Regions:
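Membrane-interface loop-to-helix entry segments
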Residues: 5-42, 101-106, 210-214, 276-284
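Helix-loop-helix connectors at the membrane interface of multi-pass transporters/channels
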Residues: 1, 88-93, 127, 160-187, ...
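Hydrophobic, membrane-embedded alpha-helices of multi-pass small-molecule transporters
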Residues: 39-44, 55-117, 141-161, 218, ...
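Hydrophobic alpha-helical segments and their helix-loop junctions in multi-pass secondary transporters
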Residues: 29-55, 73-77, 118-124, 223-236, ...
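Transmembrane helix-loop boundary segments of multi-pass membrane transporters
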Residues: 1-4, 17-27, 130-143, 173-185, ...
Length: 307
């Protein structure tokens, strides 16, 4: 089954963004519809159990909550940082407000639905795997088939866009390979990692720690990008300069590298909140290094520090 899924995802990615776009558009409606139905089934079948469990639970805004949001941001920050991999294919002039609205509508409903369903199912049955609950305990073949379809669509839509496209671009840039060869290589390498083992109950704690760990690096990268774009460049970019290999962006901006290292080191001390902890130190260090480092002089073109 995993081999078939992997082959389908690679084939879809090879066809390029036009095929991915239509697959995503169709699947998102289907997935939201299934999630709404799942929520309805859980609420009607386990309403008394859910009420009994939650009646004695006090909510918390403490470390468990913020650690969970760190894991969430760690997963989605890869997509945030690589948003240009997708937006570069947009042919229409989409304003920031419209783009933000599209991202919000596309991500939040599905994410909240899945989190809510997982929470309710765990509270009612003690099993934290909604897929297993729906496919084995509901006693409905229709619901089992629906659950399996949901898994298939969710895997394909998430993995193709988030996990194949960004590394494929990296391979293309680093080794000068074609898009087709890059996507096939990413697909083969991702299968070698055996991600289906990472989501088992035995691996849950380790996976969460791994997510928090790489958030210690993705948070600083995001901070550098945000400070550079919103504060230093006042949301104005010269695309000709960015794509000119002999232009002002030639070489390595050591101010950014040092800032990312500083932010990563700071976040390691509070691993559960790594993404949040890294933002301010990274942003502050990057701002002052861009202002003072001689080696960053060429990168100041178009910023508030330009001579």
């Amino acid at each position: 089954n995993e081999t078939i899924f992997q082959g389908d995802k690679i084939e879809l990615a090879i066809k390029g963004f036009e095929g991915i776009k239509w697959m995503e558009n169709i699947s998102c409606i289907f997935i939201i519809g299934i999630l709404i139905y799942m929520l309805y089934v859980v609420n009607t079948k386990f309403s008394s159990e859910i009420g009994n469990v939650f009646s004695g639970i006090k909510g918390t805004w403490g470390m468990p909550f913020w650690a969970a949001t760190t894991s969430f941001l760690g997963i989605y920050s890869t997509m945030i940082i690589n948003a240009s991999d997708y937006s570069r294919n947009a042919t229409d002039d989409i304003k920031p407000v419209k783009a933000t609205s599209i991202y919000t509508v596309a991500i939040l409903p599905v994410t909240l639905f899945m989190g809510l369903i997982g929470l309710l199912v765990t509270a009612a049955t003690g099993n934290s795997d909604p897929v297993e609950v729906f496919s084995t305990t509901m006693g409905s073949k229709f619901l089992t088939i629906l659950t399996l379809l949901f898994i298939a669509f969710a895997q394909v839509t998430t993995n193709v866009l988030n996990n194949i496209v960004p590394p494929a671009y990296v391979l293309m840039e680093s080794f000068k390979v074609k898009w087709t060869h890059a996507t096939i290589l990413v697909g083969v390498l991702s299968a070698c990692v055996m991600p289906w083992k990472l989501v088992t109950a035995d691996s849950a704690a380790g996976l969460s720690l791994f997510t928090q760990f790489y958030s210690a690096f993705l948070g600083p990268i995001f901070a550098v990008m945000a400070v550079d774009f919103f504060i230093l460049r006042k949301k104005k970019l010269d695309l000709n300069d960015m794509y000119d290999k002999e232009g002002c962006f030639k070489g390595i901006n050591w101010a950014a590298v040092i800032a990312i290292i500083v932010g990563s080191v700071c976040s390691v001390f509070v691993m559960q909140l790594s993404w949040y902890v890294s933002l301010i130190p990274t942003g502050v260090v990057y701002y002052f290094l861009m202002k003072t480092m001689k080696s960053s002089k060429g990168f100041r073109k178009g910023t508030i520090f330009e001579d």
